Amino acid sequence: MAFEAYRLLIANPQLYEPDFVSQAGELSEHWARENWKRREESLRHDKVCMLLMNTEPRERSHTQAEGEEEGSSSRSLATEEGEKRFSLEALEGLVDQGREVLLENLEMEEAQANSDSEGPNEADSGGEGEEFVFGVESESEMEVASEVTKLLEPDLIDSNFRYTLLEGVTSGKFAQMEFTALWGINTNNKWDLVDRVNRKLIEVKVTTRPPTGVWEEVVAHAEGTDPEHNGAYIIHDDLCGNFTPYKFGNISDLPGWPSAQDFPIRRHAFLASYGGVPSAGGIEEGLPAWDDVFMERTRNWVAPLWKKGPISVRRDDCPRMEPFNITKFITLLEDPRLRNTDKSAKWKGKILPVSWCRTIISSQEKDIDMVQEVIRDLGVIGLWEEINANPVKVERTVSALSELMRLFQEGFREKNPYISVKRKCKGWVITGHKQTPALTDTLLELGVGYKPYQMSNVVEEDMRQCETDDIEKMKWVDWMSKLAATESEPLGSKVSRDDIFKEAESRHVLDEPAKKMCSKVYDLYRSHKIGATCSKFMGFYSRMGGSYLRAIAGNSRQHSSLAIMPLYYKTYQEDGTSTRHLTGLVIRGPHHVRESTDTINLLIVEKTCLSRREAQERLSGGALVNGVWWVRKNAIRKADPTYLAFLHNSLFVPTNFLGELVTTPKHFLRQRQPRILGRNPVWQLWLL
């Protein structure tokens, strides 16, 4: 809201006409990179310059009729015949007179060149370093008819006006070049107004600083410009609605000041009504980039650093840091089991571990067939109760699940596991179904149509991020230890294929015993429930990432639709047969993720073996449906499948450690054998 008042000023047609804003503002090169405050201040300057000029006509020119009134303010008021009413003989005479002046000047230049070649002569040259320029010095040496000057003068922006506007005009730069070339004025600056009677280049300023100081800066900035041909019209703003003009450089009063004074007064009133506060420091302040006193002190402070001198080592008597003691560090750690709080940690994983799930044995191979088996086992959604969640939100989630099950079952008849979602003028709808409040609420549960507004660059009051508190400490509970124990239970079969841990061929002499040790670790992983949990995670994230990649490659365009997929892990028997163990299903919302942190919304349904009390103790934010089905919403990031689809690679750390035991036995056994192998006698058997 800091610049909103200035945006309203620009949009106010009582201050700035739309055409003026377009020509002087939007079409300018600086408009796109400035904020609203600087844009409005630039328009204010152009508007003041425009009001100060074009109010006083010049003296009658040779193109005006003799009977035309002297007070005519514009050449456009005269008729076309009146503008052309002049004598052709008089014009030819003026041209001949100009040609004679030019020939005389050329003769003078040749004579001066001859005198310079013969030798400097102070009497002939007219003074050392004196140069002749046509149109400037010639006026002092011979009289040139004023009609010639008027004839050569450029006809720019109503030539019958005394003042010509340069600021904010597309051709202003070229107009200034024409005037300065005609009058013989050298300048490197861009000016705001031109007084065509007194041949003055005028700078206009609206400032809150003392006018005298501003004029000194204008003079310094205009170094190289003839002081007789420049001046400044400085308007002082006291920030209270009063504006006082000051003239510098012997310029005439600008007759447009009454109109120009009314404009900033009205602008000040509108700014106050919009809640803006007039402040100093605008674009015309032109504050110096540095202060001489400050820079001098800075140079004096830095100067000793460059002087060479004796180097003396500073004595440091500070106490030294003690070596890190892991035993002492552990004693400083807080025991989470002893925290005095009623809140305990809950399971935050996207899907449940295998030891908490009930499985449905299936021989199906296609996802759509496995999903139908899960839906048949789920049956009709009946009783449910919220678990550590808001009952109102949970009710919406369960209702959305029931509606989605009905919609997906309609698609299963055509072997279609997707629900197409499109956006229309009235909102998001499901293809083939009328828009109803129930379907709208169902889509909202998967994030469809949830974003209430589109991102824009407009500053709003509620854009400030909410304050965040420290992470709340929770109490350690026994279910974490129990989970580690249950995940270590044997599975009765093996997950994953034998070639999942296939290693590169090597001929090192110690590779064979190292491979035997790693193979035992792999077998332990594949034959226990932790391996089944990892297999379940890998299958889920592989589908999420693979679906996204196929959509990017163009082979599948279903990433913008609702999709349903099963949750399961696969076991292998000794005879080579395989079995799929279904634990639930996932409904994936439509997504167009681009950044790595963009999310994909999910509705997850899993069959659990936890009792109501255990679910209340361990799970967070969901509903227990029909007593055994755990239902909740969640989301994953775009980058998650990149790593979690290859979760088995986490075994690299322990297997690499075992490889170090084999490849460096002397160092390891000498240093750590009593401490590690003494507590793990089974490892000694492996080393044998």
From Swiss-Prot:
Residues 56-65 have a biased composition (Basic and acidic residues). It is found in: Virion; Host nucleus. Residues 119-129 have a biased composition (Acidic residues). Transmembrane segments: none annotated. Keywords: Host nucleus, Virion. Residues 54-82, 110-129 are annotated as: Disordered. The keyword Methyltransferase does not apply. One of its GO terms (cellular component) is host cell nucleus. The keyword Isomerase does not apply. subunit of the RNA-dependent RNA polymerase which is responsible for replication and transcription of virus RNA segments. The transcription of viral mRNAs occurs by a unique mechanism called cap-snatching. 5' methylated caps of cellular mRNAs are cleaved after 10-13 nucleotides by PA. In turn, these short capped RNAs are used as primers by PB1 for transcription of viral mRNAs. During virus replication, PB1 initiates RNA synthesis and copy vRNA into complementary RNA (cRNA) which in turn serves as a template for the production of more vRNAs. RNA polymerase is composed of three subunits: PA, PB1 and PB2. This is Polymerase acidic protein. It comes from Quaranfil virus (isolate QrfV/Tick/Afghanistan/EG_T_377/1968).
